Amino acid sequence: MLDVSNFERMRIGLASPEQIRAWSSGEVKKPETINYRTLKPERDGLFCERIFGPTKDWECHCGKYKRVRYKGIVCDRCGVEVTRAKVRRERMGHIELAAPVSHIWYFKGIPSRMGLILDMSPRSLEKVLYFVAYVVIDPGDTPLVKKQLLTEAEYREYRDKYGNAFRAAMGAEAIKELLQEIDLDQLAAELRQELKESSGQRKIRALRRLEVVEAFRSSGNRPEWMIMDVIPVIPPELRPMVQLDGGRFATSDLNDLYRRVINRNNRLKRLLDLGAPDIIVRNEKRMLQEAVDALIDNGRRGRPVTGPGNRPLKSLSDMLKGKQGRFRQNLLGKRVDYSGRSVIVVGPELKMHQCGLPKEMALELFKPFVMKRLVDKGLAHNIKSAKRMVERVKNEVWDVLEEVISEHPVLLNRAPTLHRLGIQAFEPVLVEGRAIQIHPLVCTAYNADFDGDQMAVHVPLSAEAQAEARLLMMAAHHILNPKDGRPVVSPTQDMVLGAYYLTTVSKGARGEGKAFSSYDEAYMAYLNKVIDMHAMIKVRQEDGQLLETTIGRLIFNREIPIPKELGYYNCEVDKKKLTEIIARCYQLLGTEATATLLDGIKKVGFHYSTLAGFTIGIDDIVVPGDKKEIIAETESAVEKIDQQYRKGLISEEERYQKVISLWNNATDTLTKKLMAGMDKFNPVFMMANSGARGNVQQIRQLAGMRGLMADPSGRIIDLPIKANFREGLTVLEYFISTHGARKGLADTALRTADSGYLTRRLVDVAQDVIVREDDCGTTAGIEVREIQEGNQVIEKMEERLAGRYALEDVRHPETGELLVAANTMIDDDAARAIVQAGIKTVKIRSVLTCKTRYGVCRKCYGRDLATGREVEIGEAVGIIAAQSIGEPGTQLTMRTFHTGGVAGDDITQGLSRVEELFEARKPKGQAIIAETTGTITAITEVRGRREIEITDDSGEKFSYQVPYGSRLKVAEGDHVEAGDELTGGSVNPHDLLKVKGVRGVQLYLLREVQRVYRLQGVDINDKHIEVMIRQMLRKVKVEDQGDTDLLPGSLVDAFDFEDANRKVQEIGGKPATARPVLLGITKASLATDSFLSAASFQETTRVLTEAAIKGRVDPLLGLKENVIIGKLIPAGTGMSRYRQLKLVTPAVDQEEDGAEAVDMATGK
């Protein structure tokens, strides 16, 4: 067999009949499978041992030769080779067909490749192939035309008239003869000539034919190979037959399909030998063609062949397609050994890098390691007795298990794994019970809670795998979230509450104003109840300074302990503050210190939230006294508006808007009163204020009023819910509430599926983007400024600058001082300095302009958000980007919000908008954009429709019709730039590409995607979105081929296009011209260089058909292709630069059985 790790690229093509015969180990002549009495395979049948190899290791069919010593002998009685049974997984057979048949992929696929190369319509092809009509092969000297179709009657008539002067035939033989006659070079020349001369439909047709002809020419495939004389039979182990309990057999559908082909083929052979009448033979040939079609792609033409219970049989194509197909089920995701799963519970005493593993689980997972250690320590004589000891769970086993698992990390995974933090490594600690314990702080990353969630454990076996788990995947290293570079392990709930309670100040508490000589003295006073935890006191520091603080804050700083470098935190510490402390600690002191700090916060937080003894009761929900007045005032104002409406002074729409804004104001006023009137130590208030649980909106609903609700369509009902949950709702109010709740649940269910599919498409389009070099040397970049929506800042300038490389020197506009030199990274301080200097735009290096082929360079990507340092070569930034965009997808709201009113403002939001942008679809409610830079000279109204006229600088006029009901964004006399929106709505990115070019559309997409996420309160770094947009703009469409070999109208990779032009220009030829195209992510994934990646994504058969005809070569550059063929992925430590390294492990002297133990331990 082929050595998997030893080839560079993979090629797909059409197989010639000779090649199929060369693969085969023998011809399958009979449809029998196994003998029903002996249950042994029948000779020459579909499971024949002579063809495919023995069913038992080292044993022939008749039993003359048994045992290894006869290896390689072919038995003289039964003809079976004595070898391993696993050759039945790789040896193929073949069926010699009595008549050629066409391959359904090439005749029925869209476009029909056979039809294009013969210049026949698929319909007429079908007539010939399925014996409905004759096709003229050689007209001789008759008035017939080559490839003309004749019905039965016409054929007879011409036969009578001209005798044998012409040749016509039907079926695949006829098509095969026509295909054999094609001279590809001559045909290509003719088509190129026709391209130059024709136009319109004919030109398009010629182009499509030329594409297929060129594919055949360049790949070395012959057109007649689309017709098959021989059919390969796949190895029997890949279409197994197994005996069930009841003595019946279950078999793969393929065996049924093959059996039909063999039966019909044998019948056809017999009929031909007998010299049966033409019509019978023809019918049999047609049935053979249909049987082969069903085998290759059942259901593609006509009704599918069904098995028992009317279920369509699974053909070879179905084996590859879809989620259950070979690609997605077995090649991209495999089941693994050395794994287990169990319910999770919290382990508050664990360190950041630990997890609790149940004893029985650990023993089973580490069994081989334990067995080897038992032998090494002399507690067992050989592996067999060690195995017995483990199975009987002897006492010594537990001590050995402790030794084995120390320093051996395990991986914990929680489904759904939405981003890379869904799998992390921990050091196991043995625990009693049967539940896995996990550290409370990693719950955020896993999105785990303890209401019955389960997690899976995996054991990395090899030394390399353990090293990677320890150095790259340890939970203590994953402090920052790759999507925005903020800490992902900040404390939540109880811990936040504890820290907040500890650092709050209470006015006039016991012992306020007292002074102490040291921390210890103050702490003793606190323990003896002389001072209250929240009282402001003065304490002398070690440096002699008097510090005014509370004992709680001293404890917070001392007990955690907060590192000296971060200073003393003398303030209320809520969730935001805690996150900030962690982020600063990580920046200044690195991973180890942060992990220690986190464990400290966890301990102190839990301890003091317990001491605080929080409870909430109905009395803690205080309804403000002036609620009645606020509501009464609003009601009377609403009544006035209703009167105005009834008098006809205002329209229904105005009334609706006014009522809604009145009630919203009332709710806001009430909320402000409510929050102001709450006691600072009210438990409900403390929970919300500290960020532990709940928020102002929820308190408002408990103690203020529920406010306005939306109906099922999303329109706000202008009748508010005036009650709150403390007072209780009336029946009507309750009914109105249910709309929103139901919609929320339905939305969530739909959103999860949509978001998962979006992530899958994003991963697919960006999976081959890896950091491949240090600097691509580009001189281009993008200009960044802050993103605004109306008067609200969506993304601040410094967020966009931090961690990127400056393209040119950035100087202070007034002093001229150099803030950042060109090609150096802008760190957080520099970004702040730039913003403070009042600089509004900065040019930075960006992924969008990176010149690296098949990836990006370190300088264009900038900082790796998960580590806060410059990105490493080999980082799979494409997949990280896809996960960062996809993971928050579930949080985005689904539907279009019809916020009452403003016509034309109905633009899609939330997840659907993100999808619309990444798929580059034409948006609903499209905005009109200016094609040129100029001034608006007139806005006129023609028959109820408005028209905008723009005059550009040269005096040329452009006019645009505004559809009825659209909102204008411009007025007469305004100056507009090319690409500016003239009306409200979303811009069609394809139009923008034409008007503003690549850079314009890139920045537009980036801004729009950011807008959706930011307005939902999700922060994603620009660079992740940039990676995706770059993938969408990789291709160009050739317009004029010049002297290159490129075909006009074809999509080519931008880098390939430049290469082709460079080659032509070097020899002084005319370069080709092309225009950039914007592809949606699905299209871009299918247009990738790798056919393996595209085929495993969607439309498997279409991708493979095209790839085979073109003889595509997969360079195996992406991650997916390499996973599919089982190689190491070319990222991280799998990059070629690390491949040459050999891992040396110090050898231990072992006896015979010791060596065997090593083999078992590595799972070989």
Curated annotation (Swiss-Prot):
GO molecular function: DNA binding; DNA-directed RNA polymerase activity; magnesium ion binding; zinc ion binding
Cofactor (UniProt): Mg(2+); Zn(2+)
Record flagged with keyword Magnesium: yes
Cellular component GO terms, alphabetical: DNA-directed RNA polymerase complex
Keywords, alphabetical: DNA-directed RNA polymerase, Magnesium, Metal-binding, Nucleotidyltransferase, Transcription, Transferase, Zinc
Amino-acid positions noted as binding Zn(2+) 2 in the UniProt annotation, renumbered to this chain: 776, 850, 857, 860
Cofactor binding note of this UniProt entry: Binds 1 Mg(2+) ion per subunit.
EC number(s) reported in the record: 2.7.7.6
Lineage: superkingdom: Bacteria
Any one biological process term the GO annotation gives: DNA-templated transcription
List of residues binding Mg(2+): 449, 451, 453
The reaction(s) this protein catalyses: RNA(n) + a ribonucleoside 5'-triphosphate = RNA(n+1) + diphosphate
Binding annotation for Zn(2+) 1: 60, 62, 75, 78
UniProt enzyme class: transferase
UniProt family annotation: Belongs to the RNA polymerase beta' chain family.
UniProt function note: DNA-dependent RNA polymerase catalyzes the transcription of DNA into RNA using the four ribonucleoside triphosphates as substrates.
Record text on subunit structure and interactions: The RNAP catalytic core consists of 2 alpha, 1 beta, 1 beta' and 1 omega subunit. When a sigma factor is associated with the core the holoenzyme is formed, which can initiate transcription.
Protein name: DNA-directed RNA polymerase subunit beta'
Taxonomy of the source species: Bacteria, Bacillati, Bacillota, Clostridia, Moorellales
